[in-house]
């Protein structure tokens, strides 16, 4: 079936709906928010699709991201009289997404569905806490028609002014470039062909130009969008990239107990300003911005803009197989996968996971346990070399990330074979000086270099 995810299991609680490929997760937008796409052209005729099941599947999917800021891209092309839901259904759907904080009127009917009983996502506390509209930061409607305008007028009395400001219309796909990572979007071929037709019929007018700048050599002080090797070469052999070190140190000192850390987005203007300062080698003082979520967004942005994911393209297929490993052997499986990483990637990953493990240990305050952190960081650590990760791929990707965070000490405390990773310089005891003493205290950014926290391995050795 066109659009179906080949990795989709028939045991999926919503297989009857998911097999059509109507919903896809397409990485993050330029604001660091998770992107979910909805493609009308993949909706079968109404007699072949239970629209109530579609609504429940949409909620099931969004429930994985609703605690974080997120974006929806709605591809309107392909909606017709044969597959169009009724206006009454649309009104009831909007009202259901407006339910929150203890509205249980839908609960008995939902749990009575035998297929939903097998799904663990519908626990009562999580249903109470649905915040679909609150954390939806943008709804991009692509190729709107007169039907959309009529529908908007019908639903307008139900839609708040604040929510209405989140809806943005795009006549052409090219208009998405400014807001999203276009190459990560899962766009059906039918939508691409329709967009080409629209442009050719637009009376010779050229479509809105994309704002992708021409490629330029990176600055010597460049921090974003360059490889780990480039950062090492330009920072006197430092293995931990300066942006990663400074944001982690700041968050360790001031953000570990911040509720919802890493869940919120930040102003794109602020993010770009900080990126510009870092790339120009200028100092950044996060205290000046007065928002602890800004360095958290900068950290995710740095990982997301690496030319190759920190876990590397080569490890992608191995990581997808983690769900096939027996539960008791998964930690060992993670260690085996990490053995294939380049040494530099391994050291940076260990540093990052040590920090995220510390965040998870404060989850009673910040509400960010290893599972929640994995949902945020999974797609920032690994993605395929071509296209984007499918919805079904998110399960193993997030599981792998959760294991790295939850079992950090077991996975990273014992070094691999000497020829592979060995000990990082700051974990080599008397054989090497600590990293913070092995390089100058001032980096290209002009900031004072923070002191590394002791690693669990070093602490264990001291106890011995």
From Swiss-Prot:
It comes from the Eukaryota. Keywords: GTPase activation. Residues 226-412 form the Rho-GAP domain. GTPase activator for the Rho-type GTPases by converting them to an inactive GDP-bound state. GO terms for cellular component: cytoplasm; cytosol. GO terms for molecular function: GTPase activator activity. This is Rho GTPase-activating protein 8. Highly expressed in kidney and placenta. Also expressed in colon, skeletal muscle, small intestine, stomach, and testis. Not detected in brain, liver or spleen. Overexpressed in the majority of colorectal tumors examined. InterPro entries: CRAL-TRIO_dom (IPR001251), CRAL-TRIO_dom_sf (IPR036865), Rho_GTPase_activation_prot (IPR008936), RhoGAP_dom (IPR000198). Residues 439-464 are annotated as: Disordered. The record marks 263 as: Arginine finger. The keyword DNA-binding does not apply. GO terms for biological process: negative regulation of endocytic recycling; positive regulation of ERK1 and ERK2 cascade; regulation of small GTPase mediated signal transduction; small GTPase-mediated signal transduction. The gene is ARHGAP8. Residues 13-199 form the CRAL-TRIO domain. It holds the Pfam family RhoGAP.
């Amino acid at each position: 079936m066109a659009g179906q995810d080949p990795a989709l299991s028939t045991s999926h609680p919503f297989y009857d709906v998911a097999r059509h490929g109507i919903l896809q997760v397409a990485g993050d937008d330029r604001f660091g928010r998770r992107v979910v796409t909805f493609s009308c052209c993949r909706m079968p005729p109404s007699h072949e699709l239970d629209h109530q099941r579609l609504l429940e599947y949409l909620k099931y999917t969004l429930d994985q991201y609703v605690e974080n800021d997120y974006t929806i891209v709605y591809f309107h092309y392909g909606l017709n009289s044969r597959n169009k839901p009724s206006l009454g259904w649309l009104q009831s759907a909007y009202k259901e997404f407006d339910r929150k904080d203890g509205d249980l009127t839908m609960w008995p009917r939902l749990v009575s569905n035998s297929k939903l009983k097998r799904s663990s996502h519908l626990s009562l506390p999580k249903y109470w806490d649905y915040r679909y509209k609150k954390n939806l930061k943008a709804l991009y409607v692509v190729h709107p028609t007169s039907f959309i305008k009529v529908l908007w007028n019908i639903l307008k009395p139900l839609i708040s002014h604040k929510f209405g400001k989140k809806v943005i219309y795009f006549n052409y796909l090219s208009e998405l470039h400014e807001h999203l990572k276009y190459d990560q979007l899962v766009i059906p071929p039918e939508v691409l062909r329709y967009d080409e037709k629209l442009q050719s019929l637009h009376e010779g007018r050229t479509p809105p130009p994309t704002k992708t700048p021409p490629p330029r050599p990176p600055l010597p002080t460049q921090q974003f969008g360059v490889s780990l090797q480039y950062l090492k070469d330009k920072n006197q052999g430092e293995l931990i990239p300066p942006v990663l070190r400074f944001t982690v140190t700041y968050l360790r000192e001031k953000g570990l107990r911040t509720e919802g850390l890493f869940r919120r987005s930040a102003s794109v203007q602020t993010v770009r300003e900080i990126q510009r300062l870092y790339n120009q080698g200028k100092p950044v003082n996060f205290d000046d911005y007065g928002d602890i979520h800004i360095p958290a967004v900068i950290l995710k942005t740095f990982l997301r803009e690496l030319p190759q994911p920190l876990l590397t393209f080569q490890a992608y297929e191995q990581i997808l197989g983690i769900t096939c490993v027996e539960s008791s052997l998964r930690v060992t499986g993670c260690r085996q996968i990490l053995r294939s990483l380049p040494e530099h990637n391994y050291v940076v990953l260990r540093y990052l996971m040590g920090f995220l493990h510390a965040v998870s240990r404060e989850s009673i305050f910040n509400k960010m346990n290893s599972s929640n952190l994995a949902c945020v960081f999974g797609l920032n650590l690994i993605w395929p070399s071509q296209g984007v990760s499918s919805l079904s791929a998110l399960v193993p990707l997030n599981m792998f990330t959760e294991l790295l965070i939850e079992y950090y000490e077991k996975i990273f405390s014992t070094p691999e074979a000497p020829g592979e990773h060995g000990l990082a310089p700051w974990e080599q005891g008397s054989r090497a000086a600590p990293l913070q003493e092995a390089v100058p205290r001032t980096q290209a950014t002009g900031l004072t270099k923070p002191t590394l926290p002791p690693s669990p391995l070093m602490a264990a050795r001291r106890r011995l």
